[in-house]
């Protein structure tokens, strides 16, 4: 009898296999009722744990923003509606990451895979579209500074919200409606069950929106520099003060756009060039920074906002600190 220690076809420990030798046959099979099948050990991918933890942090942060905007009647301006849309999208994205972890290890089925990927695609798409809508709102509020705050602006904001959530929902429904690779693995992208074509459309759409945001922020920088120069002339500020204020505004815009690109660009480019045959570690390594964007968004767009800070202080302690009530708005607050 030739025994190969490298092959274990039964899936049982080695001492159970050795019990099947002739000298141990009586001990190996005492009776039919005493045979116990061993259950396969559940192995959890550390990357999935990190993604689930990231989703939990995303949910906690953005839930606070959603509650603040919903609870405060004063936060009903178009800007806060768009910030609320961004927070809601990121909240759903974090929830999707948590559900994906639960379904992947407890309720594995084709239906749960499609529902989870649909939720994640729709929520992250809504998040990116909300960022673009916020950029458009900032540009228009500076370009039409005297006439932007009107009923017409509110209507335009609602139209943008309906369009971005409608488009994002359609993108999320594509895998559920049949555009997936569950039946043909050769068409899979780096994120199963998304097809390669589906991932390419999402990536190209992101690059288009990033280019549009870049162009808008360049125009915003020009407007901020012009406004800061006019304010300096009217109030007889020193050139140094004008330079510092303008530099702060441009630095803020560079931080916003740079963070967005650093988080999403690696996964976007990787989705275009890679497919399901590539090692999954590359997918995790590029997808994880994309989730960090939803962690950073509340800090950049919500918690830095003076009105949201006031509302948060009112909810938590019932008062507004003097530093917030006396702070003047400057051109760097864009």
From Swiss-Prot:
Listed Gene3D superfamilies: Rhodopsin 7-helix transmembrane proteins (1.20.1070.10)
GO cellular component, one term: plasma membrane
Annotated SMART domains: 7TM_GPCR_Srsx
Pfam families noted in UniProt: 7tm_1
Extracellular topology ranges: 1-48, 100-113, 180-199, 274-282
Membrane topology value: Multi-pass membrane protein
Chain residues carrying a lipid of type S-palmitoyl cysteine: 317
Tissue: Expressed in the brain, pituitary gland and testis.
Single GO molecular function: G protein-coupled receptor activity
Membrane spanning residue stretches: 49-69, 79-99, 114-134, 159-179, 200-220, 253-273, 283-303
Cysteines paired by S-S bonds: none
Gene Ontology terms: biological process: adenylate cyclase-activating G protein-coupled receptor signaling pathway; G protein-coupled receptor signaling pathway; intracellular calcium ion homeostasis; regulation of metabolic process
Chain segments annotated as coiled-coil in the UniProt record: none
Stretches assigned to the Cytoplasmic side: 70-78, 135-158, 221-252, 304-334
Modified-residue entries (Phosphoserine), positions: 330, 332
Keywords (A to Z) from UniProt: Cell membrane, G-protein coupled receptor, Glycoprotein, Lipoprotein, Membrane, Palmitate, Phosphoprotein, Receptor, Transducer, Transmembrane, Transmembrane helix
Compartments reported by the entry: Cell membrane
Glycosylation sites: 8, 24
Physiological role: Receptor with constitutive G(s) signaling activity that activates cyclic AMP. Promotes neurite outgrowth and blocks myelin inhibition in neurons.
Stated family: Belongs to the G-protein coupled receptor 1 family.
Protein name according to UniProt: G-protein coupled receptor 12
Organism: Rattus norvegicus
Lineage per the UniProt record: Eukaryota, Metazoa, Chordata, Craniata, Vertebrata
């Amino acid at each position: 009898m030739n025994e190969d220690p490298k092959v274990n076809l039964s899936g049982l420990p080695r001492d159970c296999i050795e019990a099947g030798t002739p000298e141990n046959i009586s001990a190996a099979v005492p009776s039919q009722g005493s045979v116990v099948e061993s259950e396969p050990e559940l192995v959890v991918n550390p990357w999935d744990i990190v993604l689930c933890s990231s989703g939990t942090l995303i949910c906690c942060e953005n839930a606070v923003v959603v509650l603040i905007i919903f609870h405060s009647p004063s936060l009903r301006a178009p800007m806060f509606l768009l910030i609320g849309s961004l927070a809601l999208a990121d909240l759903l994205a974090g929830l999707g990451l948590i559900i994906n972890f639960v379904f992947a290890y407890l309720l594995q089925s084709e239906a749960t895979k499609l529902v989870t990927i649909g939720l994640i695609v729709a929520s992250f798409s809504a998040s990116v579209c909300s960022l673009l809508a916020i950029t458009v709102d900032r540009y228009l509020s500076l370009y039409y500074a005297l006439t932007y705050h009107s009923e017409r602006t509110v209507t335009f904001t609602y139209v943008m919200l309906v369009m971005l959530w409608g488009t994002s929902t359609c993108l999320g429904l594509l895998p559920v409606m049949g555009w997936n690779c569950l039946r043909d693995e050769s068409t899979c992208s780096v994120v199963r069950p998304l097809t390669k074509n589906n991932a390419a459309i999402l990536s190209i759409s992101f690059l288009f929106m990033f280019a549009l945001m870049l162009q808008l922020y360049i125009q915003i920088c020009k407007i901020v520099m012009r406004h800061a120069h006019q304010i300096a002339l009217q109030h007889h500020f020193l050139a140094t003060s004008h330079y510092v204020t303008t530099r702060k505004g441009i630095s803020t815009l560079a931080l916003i756009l740079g963070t967005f690109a650093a988080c999403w660009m690696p996964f976007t480019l990787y989705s275009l060039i890679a497919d399901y045959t590539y090692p999954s570690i590359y997918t995790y390594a590029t997808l994880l920074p994309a989730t960090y964007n939803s962690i950073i968004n509340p800090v950049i767009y919500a918690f830095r906002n003076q009105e949201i800070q006031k509302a948060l202080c009112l909810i938590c302690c019932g008062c507004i600190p003097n530093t917030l009530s006396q702070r003047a708005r400057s051109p760097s607050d864009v």
